Every structure is written in C-alpha cells, then in structure tokens.
C-alpha cells in the first residue's frame, strides 16, 4: 500500500524525532528543518531525521529571507508584544509555515505535521498560517495527540530506536533565531525565582560585562540597517554580529510574564542583544526624520501589528495592510545612530541624517536663534481658544 506523504517541521529534538517514528505507521515522512539562525548542527539534524525513519530530509537556509522579509518588519514596526517582547519565535513561524506549504506542493504531500504542544502559541501560529496559505492541507500535531508524559515519550523512543538527546536533562525549553533566544520551563516557571545564569546563553550578566563601554555606528537606508561602523553587511550578518557584540556587554536580557494567546500566563526569559540595539538605533533615526503627526500615530500601528503577529495572523489582510503602511513611512529614515553598549544598556548617544527635520537654528537658545517668538502669542490664543470657550460656558452654567 502506498502511503500518503507528510511534511514534518523537524528540529532534531526528542519530540519531532519521536514524531517521525509515530507518523511512519501511516505516512511517508519528509522532514524539513529551516535554518533561521539558531546556530544548531544542521548536518547532524539532517542525518538524524533519516536515521529515525524519514524518507527525505531537507535543511533549508532561510536566514536572509527571514531577516529581510520578517525581521525587518519587526524592526521598522518597533514590535514589542505587551511593550516588552520583540517577537522572537512569533516572527519565524509564518516563514517556516510558508516553506512547509511550498514543499508540500512540490512533493504532492497532503498533510503537514508539527511538534507543538497543546498549550502553547506556536500550534496556533503554524496551523492558522498553513490554513491561510492552503486551506486544503491537513495538519497533524503528534505531541498534542499522544498526550504522553516525558517518561512515556522516552520509553517509546528507546523502544523504537530513537536516540535520546544528550541535553535531555536540561530543565529548559529553548527556541532561537536571528532575532533572539526564548527560554522557559524549569525553575523559570516560578515567577518569584530569579533566572539563574545557566538560563542565558547569548549575553553575559550586565554586572560581569566589561567596565569600559564600546561604541558602534549603525547606518540606515530607507529604514534598513546596512552597515556597522561603515562596513556594509547583509542584514542577517549584521544582526548576528550585533548579537555577539551587544551580548558581550550584557545587552538584551528580558524577563517577561506574558499573556499567551491560549489564555494562560507564562514566564519567559528572552535574550535579544542585536534586536534591542537595532530597535533603539532605528527609533532615534525616526525621531530625527519623521514629522510629528506620523511619529505620534505610528506607535498605534506598531502596537496593533505586534498583537497580530504574536497571535499568529501574519497572513491576515489586516497584517498585510499595516505592513504596507509601515513600509510607506520608511523612505526618509536614513542616517547614522551612534550606540553606546555598556553594562546591559544600549544607549543612542548621537544621531545624524540628511533627512533630519531638526533645525539647530530654531532649537538653540543662543544668539543664533531664528525662531520668531512673537508669533507664539497669536498661536497660543488660537490653540487655546476651544479650552477658553469651554471654560467660559461652564462658568456661565455654574452661576
């Protein structure tokens, strides 16, 4: 009997490795791992999938596409879920889903499988994205279906020849990509526990960071970071370099109790050294170049966009419309931000732009001042007129 094909989003971990053998009863499994900058041993992952029963194994480098089509939206949109989380994992899920659907179409597969549990956000992100791209594809979530304890899963793995990962005893659940690292579980589940140092990997403790700051100049063209200290770089490479540099100075640690889409609160530890640095720099160039009305309105868009992406609605028309609006604001966002990295902080200490709306001759309080202060008298009268009329009417009513 010819089996149907299933495309499995494969990580190389225990859950998705067990999923291959579990799915193999009814499907020919094609394992697919997307490299979004997590830094894993991709050759090992490729070979392991075949070893545990996949008929094909694909490892696809999508770092550049991830950076240019997804991370850049988060950067230009200053996306912080609940004003704190820079959308690390949430950003990669739509791209991974898109690639899974593409491979399903190429191979004739009718089903896609993922390794998410039934209590996380990622199951929603994957399945909503896949349904948005091809509603006819079936989606299977083995971990959600088998409902095993960890011990039962390990016993199944041993019985079916699935290698047990060396780091299985780690109490943490980690997800990582170019934009940062997310960590949960173990001692972190108690929000009263301070996160221990072994929960971090990309950053040193701020108090252990160098006692002297380092400065980095970041160049932007149309809202895109294009160079570090004058060195032109692809966006993915620039982010990775900043992850290393800012991480050495303890930048980008985030401890967040967040409201998950599925209705529970979770405590997460994020490390986003490159993201935090770039977000600070980009915001300062915007402050220099955007007109006041746009600078005041854009954060409203940013907050809504953050929620849409976090909640798995990347391919929703609302998200697409907001991204289009966002892109239209970036043509003037050109310039250089000088960022000071020191003891956990990324602080913009200087900025310049050929599109700068800052006019020193208008802002100065020296004799070079060109601001017409006499014009303020009439402006104040007109600006305050509605308030004055309201006060007069209220005073008349109170008599």
UniProtKB/Swiss-Prot annotation:
Belongs to the argininosuccinate synthase family. Type 1 subfamily. Homotetramer. GO terms for molecular function: argininosuccinate synthase activity; ATP binding. Coiled coil: none annotated. L-aspartate binds at residues 117, 121-122. Pathway: Amino-acid biosynthesis; L-arginine biosynthesis; L-arginine from L-ornithine and carbamoyl phosphate: step 2/3. InterPro entries: Arginosuc_syn_C (IPR048268), Arginosuc_syn_N (IPR048267), Arginosuc_synth (IPR001518), Arginosuc_synth_CS (IPR018223), Arginosuc_synth_type_1_subfam (IPR023434), AS_cat/multimer_dom_body (IPR024074), Rossmann-like_a/b/a_fold (IPR014729). It is found in: Cytoplasm. GO terms for cellular component: cytoplasm. HAMAP family: Arg_succ_synth_type1 (MF_00005). Keywords: Amino-acid biosynthesis, Arginine biosynthesis, ATP-binding, Cytoplasm, Ligase, Nucleotide-binding. This is Argininosuccinate synthase. It is an enzyme of class 6 (ligase). It holds the Pfam family Arginosuc_syn_C. ATP binds at residues 9-17, 115. It catalyses: L-citrulline + L-aspartate + ATP = 2-(N(omega)-L-arginino)succinate + AMP + diphosphate + H(+). GO terms for biological process: argininosuccinate metabolic process; L-arginine biosynthetic process; urea cycle. The keyword Ion transport does not apply. L-citrulline binds at residues 85, 121, 125, 173, 258, 270. Its EC number is 6.3.4.5. It comes from Streptococcus sanguinis (strain SK36). The gene is argG.
């Amino acid at each position: 009997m010819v089996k149907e094909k299933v495309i499995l989003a494969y990580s190389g971990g225990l859950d998705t490795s067990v999923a291959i053998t579990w799915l193999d009863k009814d499907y020919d499994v094609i394992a697919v791992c997307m490299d979004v900058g997590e830094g894993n041993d991709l050759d090992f992952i490729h070979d392991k999938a075949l070893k545990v029963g996949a008929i094909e194994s694909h490892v696809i480098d999508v770092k550049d596409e991830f950076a240019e089509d997804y991370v850049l939206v988060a950067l230009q949109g200053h996306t912080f879920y609940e004003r704190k989380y820079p959308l690390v994992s949430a950003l990669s899920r739509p791209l991974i889903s898109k690639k899974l659907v593409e491979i399903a179409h190429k191979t004739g597969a009718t089903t896609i499988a993922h390794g998410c549990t039934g209590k996380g956000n990622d199951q929603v992100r994957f399945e909503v994205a896949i349904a948005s791209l091809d509603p006819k594809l079936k989606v299977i979530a083995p971990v959600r279906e088998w409902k095993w304890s960890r011990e039962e899963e390990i016993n199944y793995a041993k019985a079916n020849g699935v290698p047990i990962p060396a780091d299985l005893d780690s109490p943490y659940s980690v997800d990582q990509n170019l934009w940062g690292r997310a960590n949960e579980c173990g001692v972190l589940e108690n929000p009263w526990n301070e996160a221990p140092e072994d929960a971090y990997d990309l950053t040193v403790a701020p108090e252990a960071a160098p006692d002297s700051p380092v400065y980095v100049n970041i160049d932007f063209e149309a809202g895109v970071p294009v160079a570090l200290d004058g060195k032109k770089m692809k966006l993915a490479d620039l982010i990775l370099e900043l992850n290393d540099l800012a991480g050495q100075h303890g930048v980008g640690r985030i401890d967040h109790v967040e409201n998950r889409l599925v209705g529970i609160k979770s405590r997460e530890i994020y490390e986003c050294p490159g993201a935090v640095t770039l977000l600070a720099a980009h915001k300062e160039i915007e402050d220099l170049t955007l007109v006041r009305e746009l600078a005041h309105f854009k954060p409203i868009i940013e907050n809504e966009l953050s929620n849409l992406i976090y909640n798995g609605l990347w391919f929703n028309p609302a998200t697409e419309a907001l991204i289009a609006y966002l892109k239209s604001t970036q043509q003037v966002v050109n310039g250089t931000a000088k960022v000071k990295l020191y003891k956990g902080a990324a602080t913009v200490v200087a900025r310049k732009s050929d599109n700068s709306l800052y006019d020193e001759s208008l802002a100065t309080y020296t004799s070079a001042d060109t601001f017409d202060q006499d014009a303020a008298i009439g402006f104040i009268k007109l600006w305050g007129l509605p308030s004055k009329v309201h006060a007069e009417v209220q005073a008349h009513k109170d008599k």
